[in-house]
Amino acid sequence: MGIKGLAKLLSDEAPLSLKEVPLSHLHGRKLAIDASMAIYQFLIAVRSGGPGGQNAAMMLTNADGETTSHIQGIFNRTIRFISEGIRPVYVFDGKPPQFKSGELLKRREKRLKAEQALKAAEESGNIEEQDKQSKRLVRAGTKENEDCIKLLTLMGVPVIRAPCEAEAQAAALARSGKVYAAATEDMDALTFRSPVMVRKMTFANASKSDVQQIFYDKAIEGLEITHDQFVDLCILLGCDYCDTIKGIGPKTALKLIREHKNIETILKHLNREKYVVPDIYVEARRLFNHHEVLPDNEIELKWTECQPEPLKSFLVDEMGFNPDRVQASIEKLQKAFKASAKPQSRMDSFFKVKANPEGDKKKAEKRKAELAASRGKGKKGKGGGGFKKK
């Protein structure tokens, strides 16, 4: 889930922290990719139409009926990364923290509701609803993870098994300088203090070539708060470890943090009869600030040439992929790896950018004003001049 509403809040309050760039802009960068998030996205996106086009889209499978959508997605996308000169390292989730059990229970309840809705849609023949509910039932299990670990190892791409949350481990890799950024859709990578976060890296739609970079320092600066206050803000917004306070939205949460500095002081000024405050926010704060990750000295990132024959055997014999297409892709991978192995410098390494805090502040204020103006125009003509509920 990540942090509820944080992306929108940064867009409104700290627009300079967000930057859309083409994938090629990351040439020469090492990126720690949230593997579970990537696998989930490909399980949903890489699908085939039902027989005769009369049934809901289905995930790709091999002759034994085992799902292969995630394998095709990770294989093709990783080749694309390496072709762009990017060095990916995939980080897999370990055991979830105990205080995430509440969130996991909610997810199980949602899955049960989706199963019931899917059954009803199948009985009524509603294809659109079948597709919608089947996507809600998708999850990456142990087998999908192990399949991808085997694939990536044969491709020569490093894999890390995090002791706990993948986003926390990816953020730690970025903080230590072993990689440039944590690549995930979960905004809590910023709460774990990744200097740079990259989103949309594993979108399966090839036409969506742009990725989004989010810069931690500029986010903190734009929000006008400290890191400790940012952690408390994320807890108030709602995270995997702690429910949000119902009735307090992102804007109000930011206002309260700016005014009172921390959750403890906010609680002293909050009407406890009106607002229900989760009692585990202290533990949630501890998890964000002291999450279990592998020590830097235990991590060695090494990219190697792929193992052509074992890789082809895995994809063709086990996954049921087309031999000719697999061979062509392996040759493309080998060519991309050799090209990326040559010493190359990024263009921005030739230039030293002079900091201009005052200029950045003016840009941020201008951007905020533009956003406010555009929202104001959108509200004209609405009945009574009120807000439109979504």
From Swiss-Prot:
PTM section of the record? Phosphorylated. Phosphorylation upon DNA damage induces relocalization to the nuclear plasma.
The UniProt annotation puts the region (I-domain) at 129-260
Task: List UniProt keywords, sorted A-Z.
Answer: DNA damage, DNA repair, DNA replication, Endonuclease, Exonuclease, Hydrolase, Magnesium, Metal-binding, Mitochondrion, Nuclease, Nucleus, Phosphoprotein
Q: Can you supply one Gene Ontology CC term for this chain's record? A: nucleoplasm
- Taken from the UniProt record, the cysteine pairs bridged by disulfide bonds within this chain are none
For this chain, one GO molecular function annotation is: magnesium ion binding
Q: What class of enzyme is it?
A: hydrolase
Biased composition of type Basic and acidic residues is found at: 349-370
Q: How is the cofactor bound?
A: Binds 2 magnesium ions per subunit. They probably participate in the reaction catalyzed by the enzyme. May bind an additional third magnesium ion after substrate binding.
Q: Where is this region: Interaction with PCNA?
A: 343-351
Q: Where does Mg(2+) 2 bind?
A: 186, 188, 240
> CDD domains recorded for this chain?
PIN_FEN1 (cd09867)
Chief localization: nucleus
One GO BP on record is:
DNA replication, removal of RNA primer
Write the Enzyme Commission number(s) for this entry: 3.1.-.-
- Give me the residues that bind Mg(2+) 1, please: 34, 93, 165, 167
Q: Name the needed cofactors.
A: Mg(2+)
The family assignment reads: Belongs to the XPG/RAD2 endonuclease family. FEN1 subfamily.
On subunit structure and binding partners, the annotation says:
Interacts with PCNA. Three molecules of FEN1 bind to one PCNA trimer with each molecule binding to one PCNA monomer. PCNA stimulates the nuclease activity without altering cleavage specificity.
This protein is called what?
Flap endonuclease 1
- Gene name in the database record: FEN1
